[in-house]
């Protein structure tokens, strides 16, 4: 991912719009969830060969004061674009938006995305649609997220809001001034672990990777930490030996990192770490035991049902046999009675 740039926001006059209908163009911060980026990349991979870019809708949440927007999910919107015109399936966009908002009531429409860093006249038209009244984000600004998907290059992301410009209202409807806003890709520890697992398959010929167990993941994390410590140690030694230029910012960062280290003895750290490992092993053992017990209970219940069915069938057969025997004895008795009557006659 490209590094986040710094932005200076300047207030500018809006275009000629009706009184009381001007959208908000206050500076804001955009937070992007990794699953939204993956959805955009997946849409880009599935595009037609003759399409230079694809577009879609951004969904997420907005803070109460409107200064922070969090992009959580996306969905693709079909469009055709030529050098002269652009056509967007707005009806499909409205129906999909209604379905998503029904499934996720806490999310709202926050903007749209495009898989190209280029901003042109068509971008202004689409931006004005998403930021308009009714089906748009008005009175809040619509966020335009650009994600470059050129093969062989790093993924570069940019976030914009817009302000209408133009001498007349008609010109303002076809134009927009895109204002870059700061953004960040925010993820938790679980998402970071998943991203690292996916990234480990980029150098494999099969483009596949294995899922590590908790112990293996812990071992890899410790190895990475040891590697970073060795790299920092070599850098500090090279600075002391005047083999590398010193960096005040990096030195301050290392000093702050060392200040976070707990003031305890190494023996205490090792003891606590070993206790933690034992706790992890106990929890893993108990989880496996519970899983085994559940599987065994299911198998025993299935076996009892099978045996019960066979016993019921055998008992029913025996009862039918007994009824058949009684019927045979009754028939034999009736035959003997008829023979006696014939003899008396």
From Swiss-Prot:
This is Eukaryotic translation initiation factor 3 subunit F. Gene3D superfamilies: Cytidine Deaminase, domain 2 (3.40.140.10). GO terms for biological process: formation of cytoplasmic translation initiation complex. One of its GO terms (cellular component) is eukaryotic translation initiation factor 3 complex, eIF3e. Residues 335-345 have a biased composition (Basic and acidic residues). It comes from the Eukaryota. It is found in: Cytoplasm. GO terms for molecular function: metallopeptidase activity; translation initiation factor activity; translation initiation factor binding. Component of the eukaryotic translation initiation factor 3 (eIF-3) complex, which is involved in protein synthesis of a specialized repertoire of mRNAs and, together with other initiation factors, stimulates binding of mRNA and methionyl-tRNAi to the 40S ribosome. The eIF-3 complex specifically targets and initiates translation of a subset of mRNAs involved in cell proliferation. Belongs to the eIF-3 subunit F family. Keywords: Cytoplasm, Initiation factor, Protein biosynthesis. Residues 310-345 are annotated as: Disordered. Residues 322-331 have a biased composition (Gly residues). Residues 30-166 form the MPN domain. Residues 312-321 have a biased composition (Low complexity). The keyword Protein biosynthesis applies. Component of the eukaryotic translation initiation factor 3 (eIF-3) complex.
């Amino acid at each position: 991912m490209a590094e986040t740039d710094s932005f200076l926001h300047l207030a500018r006059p809006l275009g000629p719009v009706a009184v009381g209908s001007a959208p908000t163009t206050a500076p804001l911060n955009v937070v992007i969830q990794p699953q939204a980026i993956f959805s955009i990349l997946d849409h880009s991979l599935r595009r037609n060969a003759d399409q230079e870019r694809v577009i879609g809708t951004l969904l997420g949440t907005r803070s109460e004061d409107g200064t922070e927007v969090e992009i959580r999910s996306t969905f693709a919107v079909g469009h055709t674009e030529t050098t002269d015109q652009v056509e967007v399936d707005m009806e499909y966009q409205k129906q999909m938006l209604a379905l998503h908002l029904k499934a996720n009531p806490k999310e709202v429409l926050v903007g749209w995305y495009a898989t190209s860093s280029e901003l042109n006249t068509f971008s202004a038209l689409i931006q004005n649609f998403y930021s308009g009244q009714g089906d748009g984000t008005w009175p809040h600004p619509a966020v335009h997220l650009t994600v470059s998907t050129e093969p062989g290059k790093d993924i570069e992301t940019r976030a914009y809001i817009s302000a209408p410009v133009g001498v007349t209202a008609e010109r303002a409807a076809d134009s927009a001034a895109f204002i870059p806003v700061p953004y960040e890709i925010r993820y938790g520890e679980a998402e970071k672990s998943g991203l690292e697992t996916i990234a480990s398959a980029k150098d494999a010929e099969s483009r596949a990777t294995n899922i590590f167990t908790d112990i293996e993941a812990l071992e890899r994390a410790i190895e990475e930490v040891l590697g970073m410590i060795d790299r920092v140690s070599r850098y500090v030694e090279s600075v002391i030996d005047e083999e590398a230029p010193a960096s005040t910012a990096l030195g301050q960062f290392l000093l702050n990192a060392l200040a976070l280290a707990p003031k305890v003895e190494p023996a205490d750290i090792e003891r606590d770490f070993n206790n933690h490992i034992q706790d992890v092993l106990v929890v893993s053992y108990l989880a496996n035991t519970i899983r085994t017990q559940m599987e065994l209970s299911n198998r025993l219940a299935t076996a009892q049902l099978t045996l019960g069915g066979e016993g019921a069938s055998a008992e029913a057969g025996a009862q039918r046999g007994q009824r058949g025997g009684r019927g045979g004895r009754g028939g034999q008795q009736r035959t003997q009675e008829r023979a006696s009557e014939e003899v008396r006659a």
